[in-house]
From Swiss-Prot:
Its cofactor is Mg(2+); [4Fe-4S] cluster. Keywords: 4Fe-4S, ATP-binding, DNA damage, DNA repair, DNA-binding, Exonuclease, Helicase, Hydrolase, Iron, Iron-sulfur, Metal-binding, Nuclease, Nucleotide-binding. This is ATP-dependent helicase/deoxyribonuclease subunit B. The heterodimer acts as both an ATP-dependent DNA helicase and an ATP-dependent, dual-direction single-stranded exonuclease. Recognizes the chi site generating a DNA molecule suitable for the initiation of homologous recombination. The AddB subunit has 5' -> 3' nuclease activity but not helicase activity. One of its GO terms (molecular function) is metal ion binding. Signal peptide: none annotated.
Length: 1171
């Protein structure tokens, strides 16, 4: 029994010496004693390759490469102890979830924390850490007693409570495992116990290579290996000079020096012979003087400078994507120009979550074979999502999001269905569920679902059309596709008495859905498309899910569990599932994490993402215990994993390892912005490298090739997939600026795409964008007639929409596009309710031959309640009756109608105007409808403007009959003559024109009427600020002012007094007008003469004719208006259709100048030739 150390700096040949010794031994004595070669898990594959890579050693039974966990498995198979069931990480998390749920009421700190994402991952890691550091539940309990007895501050009490919770959960976890199960850490503890019994290890020659430190548990394994083996050789990265000096925590080799001392101490305790240490002083790894210099002087202070041509490259990239593309281009260049193999190259990084997806995509596009040494979670695979969402459906009362997450996995689809068709049908089905607010009991009820197109609150026709019946049948068929398998599982889960039966219910759910066959079809499809990674994913996920169910049954099969706990435990297990890495092929670029990688024999290393806070890592508290808490436990005798401070001290060694992996070339790069465009800073580590290599120039990597030289641009010509975007970029620049520059070879590349049989069609769509203009072509007369017909019948809102943006009009009224209906109460629904409520009250008053002025406050309240109760079942598929929240909203809406009724009562008392009718139709046909506003357009097309007027009021005096329009609005609005001029606000003046033009036939007395004005009435329940001692009457007066109607009224004092008979001088509280003492109008009055009203009405006719002409002649310009801070695009539903983009030359707003009313009126006169 002996111990031997092989030490040396990085690249000194420690591993090479050991491998050569083993290979020589195998050549000399192929059947001798066992040779064990122990390495970290991530080194096993490459070490195995290196061991049998010699021409004289093509295979071996005598020498085997192991990690500690693989050695444990080997020994336990030999001597026994492997009969207990192994539970993986997913099983550990599931067991911990069950333990926490059963212990929840007794936990002090973790009761609420258990609901946070990642809690069980942290808890599992904490327990694994306890085991690695030989900390038992009794140790933790004793620590709690000690802390509890001396806790005085809040921080100390928190730590004591946290340790108490950990002790409870750790103890329960160990009790659940004992005699039945083994987790990954238990294997190592069993290895310690079983090694003395192993004949396989006894007398073996043992090499331990690639480690820098050992946990206490691993140190015990090393102890037993020294006792059982013939000789143990351990390699450590240490400079021999370091061993001759006192241990200093700031030393580069501090961690490995401590490891060296700990192992020597173990050897002394076991009286193991310590052979003479073998120090390696040369640097055989490095073929580059610059890299040798970097390794030799890495920790020197001040930095030793290297002058001359260096094989170190420093690169700064515009963004993360540019950085990765720069790496990909350089890899291709090394392979093409310098005879590198892909396996000679490695990419090292730390923040993989930011890089891996980008690297997979770009390396595939660049045709670079690669292997990412990182396990991927299975959580996004359709099978995992299907199980998780199906259980959420059942436990969460069939919520919309859970149902359609399950649907979108496509595993509920029948096996033989055409997926494209089913997807379209399910999209329609989802639209139905959103529109009707389907959830909860409606899914499980046997009552068929109804489908009716919503028309209006006044539509009481109960007849169903053929198309509605057809849609209803489809919806109920699709409902059964979705709900039938889930309901079957729901019934089985409710009948289940044990966890085993619940797991069986999940299994039967998957079997009845033919999931194995569906996954096999997905695997075949992935293989046919060349995506072998995803093909293996579909195989792995079924095996892992079945293993998870088996583990669940093995651990908790006979226990009873509530459905909610079963769902939580199962979800926790599913979240922990990971895809196993496929072993790398013989020729791939290795992409690995800096902290976990153990590279050897790579010629070139790319270290990417070298940003501040990443390399070196910023201090960060993670896990269950903070640094301060770990220090307290350490002081009390419980050794755990290093604190953040200790980790930061070790960071220099990590970076040293990082830059000493390559033999020939080192590339260091960082992006200046992340994927979202946020600024990133270069690491101080890059500054250090620059000080060591002052002649190395920092190269900037960009995806914009315009500023690059011709030789640099040529490097951007890689695979057809990635080069296409650069061709586009260059030719777009040429098109926009006419710059020739280096375009000669880019035209050659362009010619490749347009002449290649393979790429001609693939590239045509992309290249056609060179000539793309986001300009809508005018419709032909034939197409216009097909879309709109020979007679246009449209509302005023439609005409205004055309003037806001002709393309939006085309999308809505030509193509009939609309957003999908969602079961929610929007502003238009509330507006419709307000109109209907006020009309019902007004109709009741007319039937009773009463006016608003006749109502009492109590009657206002009663009537508002009655009409809201009548309307609620009719509005938006009974949305106001669908939930407590909507019921509360219904009450608030009733209060608004109540308040509005009171104001209308006050207005009526103060006004000589009385309502003639409400919701007055024109051009709608039927009894009581006024005729439309008709136009014969120059191209022969007839156009009718139709609509419905909220309210028409009438007043009479010795000067005749006056009519005014009142429009109810749920938001504050005024009439802007600038908007009238631009055709954006035509509604009120159109209504006034319709009623005054038809007054002689419409009014009972049969004589003409004059325009009195147009006014907006804001329906709301305002809050007013008053002094503390204000009376109720004063409060009501302030509220009344909030309802002042804005608009435009006839500039006639008598007519204005008819609107507010309390007005003598000053401003009216009812309308936006006021009188001076001399009888003239105040400056802030919104008034117009009768002649001006006539001019405005002519202008409205003129505008409609122009709109009609443009519509029928096919104008669909993408030309939205912009006026001040208002723009047509702000609330437009069709932005994704027109793709309006101000950066394009063709896409610019029609900027409308804001004007004073007087200026707008003057321009209107000019247009119609008014006086």
């Amino acid at each position: 029994m002996s111990l031997r150390f092989v030490i040396g700096r990085a690249g000194s040949g420690k591993s090479t010496l050991c491998l050569h010794e083993v290979q020589e031994e195998l050549k000399q004595r192929p059947r001798g004693e066992t040779i064990l070669y122990l390495v970290p898990e991530q080194m096993t594959f490459q070490t195995q390759q290196a061991l049998i890579g010699s021409e004289d050693v093509r295979g071996s039974i005598r020498a085997q490469v192991f990690s500690f966990s693989r050695l444990a498995w080997k020994v336990l198979q030999e001597v026994g102890g492997a009969s207990r069931l192994h539970i993986d990480e997913a099983g550990v998390h599931m067991l911990l979830r069950k333990i926490v749920e059963s212990r929840k009421d007794g936990l002090s700190v973790f009761q609420k924390a258990a609901e946070q994402n990642g809690f069980f991952e942290h808890l599992g890691s904490m327990i694994a850490e306890f085991k690695r550091y030989n900390v038992t539940p009794s140790n933790v309990y004793e620590m709690w007693q000690q802390l509890d007895a001396h806790s005085s501050s809040a921080e100390q009490k928190l730590l004591a409570n946290k340790v108490y919770d950990l002790q409870l959960l750790y103890d329960d976890f160990e009790r659940a495992l004992i005699g039945k199960y083994l987790d990954s850490e238990d294997y190592l503890q069993l290895l310690v116990e079983k090694l003395p019994q192993s004949e396989y290890v006894k007398g073996a020659e043992i090499y331990i290579d690639g480690f820098h430190s050992f946990s206490p548990q691993e140190l015990e394994i090393v102890r037993q290996l020294m006792i059982c083996g013939a000789r143990v050789t351990i390699t450590l990265t240490i400079d021999e000079k370091t061993l001759a000096q006192p241990v200093n925590e700031l030393d580069l080799f501090y961690e490995t020096t401590l490891t060296y001392e700990k192992i020597k101490q173990v050897a002394r305790e076991e009286k193991i012979e310590i052979e003479k240490t073998i120090p390696l002083m040369e640097q055989p790894r490095f073929h580059s003087p610059a890299l040798a210099h970097l390794e030799k002087h890495y920790e020197a202070r001040p930095n030793e400078k290297f002058h001359g041509e260096a094989s170190v490259t420093i690169r700064t990239a515009a963004n993360l994507r540019a950085e990765v593309e720069g790496v990909a281009r350089e890899i291709r260049r090394l392979v093409a120009d310098e005879d590198y193999r892909y396996r000679d190259i490695a990419v090292l990084l730390r923040n993989g979550e930011s890089y891996y997806d980008v690297m997979r995509t770009l390396f595939t596009d660049y045709n670079i074979p690669h292997f990412i040494d990182e396990k991927r979670p299975m959580s996004h695979h359709p099978l995992v999502e299907c199980i998780r969402s199906a259980l959420e459906i059942i436990s969460g009362n069939w919520r919309y999001d859970a149902v359609f997450r399950c649907v979108k996995t496509e595993l509920l689809y029948p096996l033989d269905v055409r997926k494209e068709t089913m997807r379209e049908e399910m999209d329609e089905f989802e639209n139905y569920c959103l529109a009707y607010g389907v959830q909860g009991k409606r899914w499980t009820s046997e009552d068929p679902w109804m489908y009716r197109r919503y028309r209006s609150l006044d539509d009481t026709n109960g007849m169903i059309t053929d198309s509605e019946r057809e849609m209803e049948e489809k919806i109920n068929r699709l409902r059964d596709v979705v709900r039938t398998p889930v309901i079957r599982m729901q019934k089985r889960l409710k009948r289940a008495g044990t966890v085993m039966q619940m797991c069986e219910a999940v299994y039967l759910f998957l079997e009845e859905l033919d999931v194995p066959k569906k996954l096999e079809a997905l695997r075949i499809r992935a293989e046919e498309s060349g995506d072998f990674l995803f093909a293996t994913d579909h195989e792995q996920v079924w095996e892992e899910v079945m293993s998870l169910l088996d583990t669940f049954v093995e651990m908790l099969g006979e226990e009873k569990m509530s459905l909610s706990m079963f769902t939580d435990v199962m979800s926790t297990g599913l979240e922990a599932l990971q895809f196993a890495n496929i072993p790398p092929s013989l020729d791939q670029v290795l992409i690995a994490n800096i902290d976990r990688s153990r590279l050897s024999n790579v010629k070139a290393t790319f270290v990417i993402g070298v940003n501040e806070g990443v390399i070196p890592a910023a201090p960060m508290d993670e896990g269950m215990l903070s640094d301060e808490e770990r220090d307290v436990l350490s002081a009390a005798g419980i050794e755990l994993a290093p604190t953040t401070r200790q980790t930061l001290l070790e960071e220099q060694f990590v970076m040293y390892q990082m830059v000493t992996r390559a033999t020939e070339k080192l590339y260091i790069s960082c992006p200046l912005a992340d994927e979202e465009g946020k600024t990133l800073l270069a690491s101080s580590f890059i500054k250090k490298i620059k000080r060591m290599f002052p002649d190395v120039k920092d190269t900037f990597i960009t995806n914009d090739v315009n500023d690059l030289s011709r030789s640099e641009q040529i490097l951007y010509v890689a695979t057809p997939e990635v080069t296409l975007s650069y061709v586009m970029q260059q030719l777009q620049t040429w098109k926009r600026y006419g710059f020739e520059g280096n375009l000669d070879f880019w035209w050659d590349v362009y010619n490749f795409y347009v002449t290649s049989d393979e790429w001609k069609q693939k590239s045509s769509r992309v290249l056609s964008s060179l000539f793309y203009r986001n300009r809508a072509q005018k419709l032909s007369t034939a197409v216009s007639r097909d879309l709109y017909g020979d007679k246009i019948k449209g509302s005023v809102s439609r005409m205004e929409l055309f003037n806001r943006c002709a393309y939006a009009h085309f999308a809505q009224h030509g193509l009939s596009l609309r957003e999908r209906d969602i079961f929610k109460l929007d502003a238009p629904d509330i507006g419709e309710l307000f109109h209907a409520a006020l009309k019902r009250i007004a109709d009741r008053l007319l039937r009773e031959n009463r006016t608003w002025a006749d109502l009492s406050i109590k009657e206002c309240e009663h009537l508002s309640t009655v009409v809201i109760e009548e309307i609620a079942p009719l509005l938006q598929r009974q949305i106001l009756l669908s939930s407590n929240r909507h019921f509360y909203l219904k009450q608030k809406l009733q209060q608004i109608i109540f308040r509005t009724s009171i104001i209308l009562r006050e207005h009526a008392k103060s006004s000589g105007f009385v309502p003639v009718d409400l919701e007055v139709p024109f051009g709608m046909g039927g009894t009581g409808s006024l005729p439309p506003m008709e136009f014969s357009l120059p191209n022969g097309v007839k156009m009718e403007v139709v609509g419905r007027i909220d309210r028409v009021d009438k007043a009479e005096d010795e000067n005749g009959t006056f009519l005014r329009i009142i429009d109810y609005k749920s938001s504050s609005k005024a009439l802007d003559l600038t908007e009238v001029y631009y055709g954006l606000a035509l509604q009120m003046l159109t209504y006034l024109d319709v009623v005054t033009s038809n007054a002689h036939t419409w009014m009972k007395k049969g004589h003409a009427a004059s325009p009195a004005g147009v006014l907006y009435f804001h329906i709301h329940n305002p809050i007013v600020e008053v002094k503390g001692d204000a009376s109720e009457a004063e409060i009501e007066k302030e509220i009344l002012k909030k309802f002042k109607m804005k608009g435009l009224v006839l500039g006639d004092a008598d007519v204005v007094r008819l609107m507010d008979n309390k007005l003598s001088t000053g401003s009216s509280d009812i309308i936006s007008a006021g009188l001076k003492k001399d009888g003239s109008f105040s400056a802030r009055s919104s008034i117009a003469s009768e002649q001006e009203f006539n001019v405005l009405q002519k202008y409205v006719h003129h505008t409609f004719e122009n709109i009609g002409k443009d519509i029928t002649e096919g104008v669909i310009d993408i030309a939205p208006y912009k006026k001040g801070n208002k723009a047509a695009c702000t609330f437009c539903n069709f932005k994704s259709v027109c793709q309006f983009d101000e950066s394009l030359e063709d896409n610019q707003f029609r900027t409308l100048k804001d004007m004073k009313d007087s200026e707008a009126m003057e321009k209107i006169r000019e247009e119609v030739g008014g006086e």
